[in-house]
């Protein structure tokens, strides 16, 4: 193992992988004219010219694409890798394969796992503006723009080339034979560490970086027996010893328990949710949930029986065993019809979301624009929401119990009956036709409308004053009788109408008749 160098190799372009930018396409026939390299080109970090860490010893055109080899010889950079290994948890994560520990290779696989080629734009090739040097440099980076450009680090070139299963034996032999010897000149690693830290921070916010590295590793055909950390997960080096539990005690703790006595959930299982959103989800869940032991389904109203159900009144009557009836009766009984009860027309009770279970919605919290959050730091707004949720947990549980009690309230169903009620034609939307034989022959009016008037109205007596002749009291009695007979004589019905007025002719005739009677009585 050499302490002064570290070898690296990998694809800088795979022809079968699609490119997002057309300028990233490398035509094998066009670029093969500038290969192989006549001299070594710089190997840098994140395309910083002052961050040169070694030399590129070869660029080779193979069946899959463009392959490169390089060597890291900068002493300052190698010392930086040794110091980073002592503080990096991911780098100290042991590889899955049975490989010896290599701190420098493990740090580079965790920090700079891919390669990036810097070359002339394809549009300038073959023109008068084509520069003399087509390939500028190759950089170690956190994630390349071309897919499949995964780097493999090792202590020897032969070991590094053996990790690529996509290379044939002829390609491996050709690369090992034609690789250049690095220059004896030491590379200039004078970059400020702040620039490297800034790039490392930016790499932490690349979307889907880990999954992309896994796909690039598969595209390059790299063997699992490498130090690549694309699928590594940070683990704690020290674990707390388990507490002593008595025999028979359950040592498993469910992290999803909730309540005052529940253990705290792990940090990875906590999802910050605003209070308004949590209440809305809880409300919709409770409204859709029906009690386990619900009431029986409601009875169907009249006129909604299907072909499977038996209509009321058409079920055969079964006589009880040992019961002797006084007379033979029909097999089918139709008890006396009783009017429908009020609850027969009630629809099935349903929970109204608008007026029963819905709670007054609170105004959703607006995200403050001036809220500043840093990577790895929990947001203040989410922390406040979690605190409020923990304080109001008892209130939410009480509300859930009240909603369940409302749903479990029994419905006022009628008591079961032993016999079906009588057949009701209205149940099928039919009305019984009247029997013409039972129609009355002549119109008979009831005294319902006139009994009050006849009881309250007294016989009307009209007295005609006669100053010339005195009428005795005994002689006035027939006059009253005549008036009563006149009023009672007609058999026609009388209807009290509030807007009706007596006819004037009737009053005049009664007056003349009375005058005639007075004349007859006076002559006797």
UniProtKB/Swiss-Prot annotation:
Keywords from the named record: Host cytoplasm, Host nucleus, Hydrolase, Phosphoprotein, Protease, Serine protease, Viral capsid assembly, Viral release from host cell
Disulfide bonds: none
Region (Interaction with pAP): 268-287
Annotated site, Cleavage, chain positions: 230-231, 498-499
UniProt motif (Nuclear localization signal) ranges: 359-365
GO cellular component: host cell cytoplasm; host cell nucleus
Domain comment, as recorded: Region of interaction between pPR and pAP is called Amino conserved domain (ACD). The region of interaction with major capsid protein is called carboxyl conserved domain (CCD).
Name of the molecule in the record: Capsid scaffolding protein
Organism: Alcelaphine herpesvirus 1 (strain C500) (AlHV-1)
């Amino acid at each position: 193992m050499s302490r002064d160098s570290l070898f690296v190799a990998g694809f800088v372009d795979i022809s079968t992988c699609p490119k997002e930018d057309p300028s990233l396409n490398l035509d094998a026939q066009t670029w093969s004219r500038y290969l192989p390299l006549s001299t070594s080109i710089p190997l840098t970090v994140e395309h910083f010219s002052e961050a040169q860490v070694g030399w590129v010893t070869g660029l080779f055109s193979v069946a899959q694409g463009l392959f490169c080899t390089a060597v890291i010889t900068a002493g300052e950079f190698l010392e930086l890798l040794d110091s980073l290994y002592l503080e990096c948890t991911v780098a100290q994560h042991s590889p899955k394969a049975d490989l010896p520990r290599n701190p420098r290779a493990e740090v580079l696989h965790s920090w700079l796992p891919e390669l990036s080629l810097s070359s002339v734009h394809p549009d300038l090739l073959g023109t008068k503006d084509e520069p003399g040097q087509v390939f500028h440099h190759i950089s170690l980076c956190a994630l390349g723009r071309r897919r499949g450009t995964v780097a493999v680090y090792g202590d020897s070139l032969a070991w590094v080339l053996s990790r690529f299963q996509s290379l044939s034996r002829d390609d491996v032999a050709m690369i090992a034979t034609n690789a250049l010897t690095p220059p004896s000149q030491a590379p200039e690693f004078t970059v400020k560490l702040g620039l490297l830290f800034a790039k490392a921070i930016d790499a932490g916010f690349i979307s889907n970086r880990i999954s992309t590295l896994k796909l690039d590793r598969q595209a390059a055909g790299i063997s699992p027996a490498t130090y690549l950390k694309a699928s590594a997960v940070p683990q704690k080096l020290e674990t707390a010893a388990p507490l002593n539990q008595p025999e028979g005690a359950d040592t498993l703790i469910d992290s999803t328990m909730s309540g005052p006595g529940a253990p705290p959930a792990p940090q990875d299982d906590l999802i910050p949710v605003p209070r308004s959103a949590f209440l809305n989800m809880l409300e919709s869940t409770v409204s859709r949930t029906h009690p386990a032991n619900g009431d029986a389904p409601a009875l169907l109203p009249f006129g909604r029986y299907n072909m499977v159900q038996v209509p009321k009144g058409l079920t055969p009557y079964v006589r009880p065993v040992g019961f002797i009836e006084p007379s033979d009766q029909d097999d089918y009984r139709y008890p006396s019809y009783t009017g429908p009860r009020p609850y027969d027309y009630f629809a099935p009770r349903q929970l109204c979301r608008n007026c029963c279970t819905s709670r007054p919605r609170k105004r959703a919290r607006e995200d403050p624009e001036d809220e500043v959050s840093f990577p790895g730091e929990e947001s203040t707004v989410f922390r406040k929401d979690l605190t409020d949720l923990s304080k109001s947990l008892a209130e939410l549980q009480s509300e859930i119990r009240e909603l369940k009690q409302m749903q479990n309230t029994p419905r006022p169903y009628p008591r079961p009956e032993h016999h079906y009620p009588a057949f009701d034609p209205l149940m099928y939307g039919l009305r019984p036709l009247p029997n013409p034989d039972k129609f009355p022959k002549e119109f008979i009016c009831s005294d319902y409308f006139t009994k009050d008037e006849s009881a309250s109205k007294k016989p009307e007596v009209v007295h005609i004053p006669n100053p010339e002749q005195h009428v005795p009291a005994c002689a006035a009695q027939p006059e009253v009788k005549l008036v009563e007979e006149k009023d009672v004589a007609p058999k026609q019905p009388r209807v009290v109408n509030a807007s009706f007025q007596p006819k004037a002719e009737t009053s005049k005739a009664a007056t003349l008749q009375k005058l005639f009677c007075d004349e007859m009585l006076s002559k006797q």
